[in-house]
């Protein structure tokens, strides 16, 4: 339909922003990393010898820089300083899902080239949408990556299991984990059979369970049956009221579970749930997995949330 000119106005706006600024939000591409701490950016750039790379992603770069900052800080405690893909653009999956195929393919080709030219052996990705794009859509459409793409929850849990990162601070909190639908419903073998899949249910939970004093509670709808929080780009652009109502459904589940803090494995989920919490004046805190790990490590200066 989009290719035949029947796209909604919201899709047209996203296409225009992407073509102009290489991200669906229309934020200035030249300022992609401007909100991230200067010292952090300096550490992860100009590292031709690095064999581990990291992908920032649009939402983190423009609205949730503390996620990336805490991820790098945690990795540093394990003796790892990854290389950032400083020329990155949107992964293309949001555009593909909206029918903007040619726009998506242009992004995929560009990103595949810069990732392959980086010569990294592993690429740590925090955004579930980017993770799914690189592992499923890129190879499906012929944009093969010459590196292993790993979600940050898996990488951090491997470090925790090996003792490379520690948890020496008791948080003494009841915490819920919300499964991002991209991780829990679209990368699991139970839902998709036509490509190699990866179940991202256990790693985030095991990571949280390593933290002393945390009582982790499950939401009623979890794992492959988890509810979306409504953060999808198309929903936000064209049906924002519905998106907020969907988020309230998830927040109601968190409240019924008895938690006031929720950990998410998705920058978009953190951004959207936090926005609804602020608008509704609710007493919840949303943090990412890298942030909760940093909170539990006294050697780190945990970077606080910032207003968007």
Give residue spans per PLM region.
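Short, solvent-exposed amphipathic alpha-helices that sit
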Residues: 66-78, 195, 199-210, 220, ...
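Short, flexible loop segments at boundaries between secondary-structure elements
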Residues: 20-21, 143-171, 213, 221-224, ...
């Amino acid at each position: 339909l989009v290719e035949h000119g029947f796209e909604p106005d919201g899709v047209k706006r996203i296409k225009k922003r992407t073509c102009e600024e290489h991200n669906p939000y229309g934020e200035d591409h030249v300022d992609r990393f401007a909100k991230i701490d200067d010292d952090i950016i300096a550490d992860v750039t100009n590292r031709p010898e690095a064999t581990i790379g990291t992908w920032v992603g649009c939402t983190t770069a423009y609205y949730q820089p503390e996620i990336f900052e805490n991820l790098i800080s945690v990795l540093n405690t394990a003796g790892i300083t990854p290389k950032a893909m400083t020329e990155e653009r949107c992964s293309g999956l949001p555009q593909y899902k909206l029918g903007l195929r040619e726009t998506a393919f242009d992004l995929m080709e560009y990103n595949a080239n810069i990732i392959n030219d980086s010569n990294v052996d592993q690429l740590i990705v925090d955004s579930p949408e980017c993770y799914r794009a690189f592992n499923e859509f890129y190879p499906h459409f012929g944009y093969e990556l010459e590196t292993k793409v790993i979600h940050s929850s898996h990488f951090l849990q491997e470090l925790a299991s090996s003792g490379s990162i520690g948890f020496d601070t008791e948080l003494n909190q009841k915490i819920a984990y919300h499964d991002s639908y991209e991780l829990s419903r679209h990368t699991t073998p139970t839902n998709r059979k036509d490509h190699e899949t990866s179940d991202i249910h256990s790693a985030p939970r095991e990571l949280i369970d390593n933290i002393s004093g945390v009582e982790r509670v499950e939401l009623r709808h979890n794992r492959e049956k988890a509810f979306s929080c409504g953060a999808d780009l198309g929903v936000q652009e064209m049906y924002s009221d519905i998106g907020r109502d969907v988020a309230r459904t998830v927040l109601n589940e968190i409240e019924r579970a008895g938690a006031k803090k929720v950990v998410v494995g998705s920058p978009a989920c953190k951004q959207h749930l936090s926005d609804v919490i602020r608008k509704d004046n609710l007493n919840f805190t949303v943090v990412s997995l890298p942030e909760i790990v940093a909170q539990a490590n006294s050697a780190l200066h945990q970077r606080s949330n910032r207003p968007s």
